Amino acid sequence: MDMFLNKEDFFISCFNSKKIGDDAAIIGDWIVSKDAFFEDVHFKRKWFELDDIAYKSMIINISDSIAMNADPKYALLAVALPSSLSKPDIKKLYSGFKRAADEFGIEIIGGDTVSNIKIDITVTVLAKSKRVLRRVGLKTGDLLAYTGNLGSSKKALTSLLRYNNARKSSRFFKPELRQKFISKATSSLHCGMDISDGLFADLKKLSKANKLGFNFSNEIPKSIACSGEEYEMLVGFCPRKRKKMLRLAKAQRCELNIFAKARRKEYKLKCKAHHF
């Protein structure tokens, strides 16, 4: 297993909280998530327009709410800004935050700003859900599936690292969140999470949460399964729900790829962590 994920697991275990372990924490009626988006860790400034940096920093956090079938309501922003940024630059950042917030009906209610040599953004989203979708709940014999097409983000990242250029239509720049599908499907799903670190890496998290492994229907290329920052959904459901899931996905114009079955076996991670 990747060294960083070992350290991440160790760090999380130090807190010994039952609220940690899903895409977001459940506190009463609220679903609370936080994500960081740091320059030279998650992105390089030359890759993005400023408004796109702000937009993506919001979207990756909103994804955590949607992954738990929660409706995002409010957001808090912590933004570190270089002194070299002009007022028009800051206005561009604002427009990116607002674009994402407006898209999902979110009100930005506060936060903090500090000076820094790089752009670092941390977003907290508060959401509500009538029926929470969690990582825990997968059963032996359940089918595993992911939405959409994976691999675009890794392809774009490779191109950016080599040539400082990639198609702006790539999911690396603008992930597509599956809010409508998850809202319709949650009552028939046993578990779910978003694919942020890559399919194989996130399967490891699902395996750990449910103490199960997987039998794959076909070999999945690493170019697909090791592509992080896709923000598609990874879900598990009873085989009897197969036709219903495919029908729901089609109705929402969302491709659903069934690729494995849950089994009582060990699952070994086949990829390195996406960022580290």
Residues covered by each model-derived region:
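Helix-biased detector of long, well-ordered alpha-helical tracts
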Residues: 1-276
